[in-house]
Curated annotation (Swiss-Prot):
UniProt xrefs under SUPFAM superfamilies: L-aspartase-like (SSF48557)
Known catalytic reactions: 2-(N(omega)-L-arginino)succinate = fumarate + L-arginine
E.C. designation(s): 4.3.2.1
Organism lineage: Bacteria, Bacillati, Cyanobacteriota, Cyanophyceae, Oscillatoriophycideae
Compartments (UniProt record): Cytoplasm
Coiled coil: none
Chief location of this protein within or outside the cell: cytoplasm
Protein name per the record: Argininosuccinate lyase
Pfam families linked: ASL_C2 (PF14698), Lyase_1 (PF00206)
UniProt keyword Disulfide bond present: no
GO molecular function: argininosuccinate lyase activity
Keyword Plastid applies: no
Listed PANTHER family: ARGININOSUCCINATE LYASE
Amino acid sequence: MTVRQKKTWSDRFEGSLHPAIVEFNASITFDIELIEYDLTGSIAHAKMLAKTGIISEAEAQKLVNGLEQIRQEYRDGNFTPGIDQEDVHFAVERRLTELVGDVGKKLHTARSRNDQVGTDIRLYLRDQIQQIRSQIQAFQQVLLTHAQENVETLIPGYTHLQRAQPISLAHHLLAYFQMAQRDWERLGEIYQRTNVSPLGCGALAGTTFPIDRHYSAELLGFEEVYGNSLDGVSDRDFAIEFLNAASLIMVHLSRLSEEMILWASQEFGFISLTDSCATGSSIMPQKKNPDVPELVRGKAGRVFGHLQGMLVLMKGLPLAYNKDLQEDKEAIFDGVKTVKGCLEAMTVLLGEGITFRKERLSEAVAEDFSNATDVADYLAAKGVPFREAYNLVGKVVKTSLASGKLLKDLTLEEWQALHPNFEADIYDAIAPKQVVAARNSYGGTGFEQIYQAVERAKQQLELS
């Protein structure tokens, strides 16, 4: 069936648009996400038109009332435009004209869909950035709570996924806190570059009407306006920057997820999953699966794909606006939804879904040679060149492995046979708690440093 719904631009054309092209061209199925922002932007535009005398105050009030009625209809579920409306902007304008008559046709004076959609996306993303930043803080708070409770809980630290040195569990958790802090700060910087108004740039070259762009920007809470209309309608740097920041958030969540998956396995056994945040198997009744971190790890690739897609979308576009830019919205919308969903899920998982198995952690830091570096440090502190000490300890580890002993199991005679500088205090030096406490350099895992790091983290949350 041929679609005969009249388009705002259709008087230039003869006949009707092919139904397949109507469907292909339409964005209403996804850009309806912008409707609240489109209405807000249009209200500001109507007020600006009245302020500058382009329309009367009475006309502006009719437009504002009509737009607010559409907002209520949408919230009540009574405004559900179909693909014949093409996009959210045309759908709103058509409904507005139905509500207020011909004055509705004046709303688009001194405005193009090009600057209109750019305004909508910025308003949308501005809100979403603030919401995500709040979610990051909630995530950080859960990490901080665990850190405060586990300053002196020890856990193996790894390099190459091989046990390296024991560390404070709080130190490990605070590493993710700092990653999240950078994410929070990065989004704040992107917010500033998003908070610039393109409204009034027109299709590409501005307008002949005596508009006041700074006034409409002020009404919408924008801090600046674009100084070049071509740039204003074609810029999507802010969206790419957001997806880049979103990708980094997902990198951090995915890394933590990978560790949660490993730690929940029988091979590690560092955490237990609560029933509220784990699932079972359809065939193996003994299973408790870490679906939440697995899904977060998987969804990271989805956000990375949106970033790559946006870069490829933009790389070949000549100035100014091109229909290709319709493809930016689904990437932005899904990127936002995915990041928010993953942040919420991981916050719940950390807050309610895991229990640290402290007995197992204590065993893990005492059952290997992760205190070997401290033996080398012990000798170096007694004047033995570090590299010489390092080589000696390597031989000690090799000998101990062959005899089935850990370093703590060697007798003092065995130690002194290896080097005369070993004394009885070697056992204190290689005890797990002392190994951790001794690393008291700024930013290290020493308990004194971790207590200070916890306080700094508290202050960061309080100031943000």
